[in-house]
Amino acid sequence: MSTFSLKIIRVGITVLVVVLAVIAIFNVWAFYTESPWTRDAKFTADVVAIAPDVSGLLTEVPVKDNQLVQKGQILFVIDQPRYQQALAEAEADVAYYQTLAAEKQRESSRRHRLGIQALSQEEIDQASNVLQTVQHQLAKAIAVRDLARLDLERTTVRAPAEGWVTNLNVHAGEFINRGATAVALVKKDTFYILAYLEETKLEGVKPGYRAEITPLGSNRILHGTVDSISAGVTNSSSSADSKGLATIDNNLEWVRLAQRVPVKIHLDSEDQQYLYPAGTTATVVITGPNDRDPHQASPMTKLMHRLREFG
């Protein structure tokens, strides 16, 4: 084979390799830009901070950390005898003022029947004033009794919804103050995704669009629907000085970092069964109005789907 032919073959191979490289780079670029996506997404759920409405010693904590509880199930009980005694005293006051009010009512009615022929107007008015005072005291006693009854009811703290007890940090015998968070309850069937997408990718994101969610380290692909896009994020480049004037950070004009915007994605109901703890990471791809058919993807596309998980 002549030297000229070898040169032709070498040039042809080089051109072929370059063309294949360009095609591969174009396909990878198209894959990464055809759908808005991010690796910065978090599983999130509705979390209820459980705190008692009364103070006292904890006498019962019948649940364990990370336990699934039903709505209305007892989480913990605060020492009740003190609140039972307060209710008993309040009920005794109500009974006393009810008896006294009935007596003053009879006396006032009797004086009104006798009239000014037998009694002075001052005595009649005095009986009416005493009755009003006793009725006012009775109303206050009833309010105190109702509050004491409410306090007694709230010594038993129940789960407001079905969910998982998380970060249980109290035990029987401890004293707990009113309003102090004792445990967090992660509500069941409330899991959703917060995907932090760059502002340059928001053009392809709309409420109602479908999304693919791949938990970090998992081969399972979950599906969801875009619920909403955050209406605002913090402007980290601007702040106020001690006099209230705007302070703008210096910025290099040729370096413009895209701001990330939270996008809320609701998981499909059939995917709520897969338990990925709130706060864990996932990769999210917005596929548009419809889901993608995984059976139509080429092996190369499937490989790039997997590589996207790692960047």
From Swiss-Prot:
Its main location: membrane. GO terms for biological process: transmembrane transport. InterPro entries: CusB-like_dom_1 (IPR043602), CusB_D23 (IPR032317), MFP_Efflux_Pump (IPR050393), PHBA_efflux_pump_AaeA (IPR022871), RND_pump_MFP (IPR006143). The chain crosses the membrane at residues 11-31. It is a single-pass membrane protein. It is found in: Cell inner membrane. The keyword Membrane applies. It comes from the Bacteria. Keywords: Cell inner membrane, Cell membrane, Membrane, Transmembrane, Transmembrane helix, Transport. Pfam families: CusB_dom_1 (PF00529), HlyD_D23 (PF16576). Belongs to the membrane fusion protein (MFP) (TC 8.A.1) family. Forms an efflux pump with AaeB. This is p-hydroxybenzoic acid efflux pump subunit AaeA. It comes from Yersinia pestis. The lineage of its organism: Bacteria, Pseudomonadati, Pseudomonadota, Gammaproteobacteria, Enterobacterales.
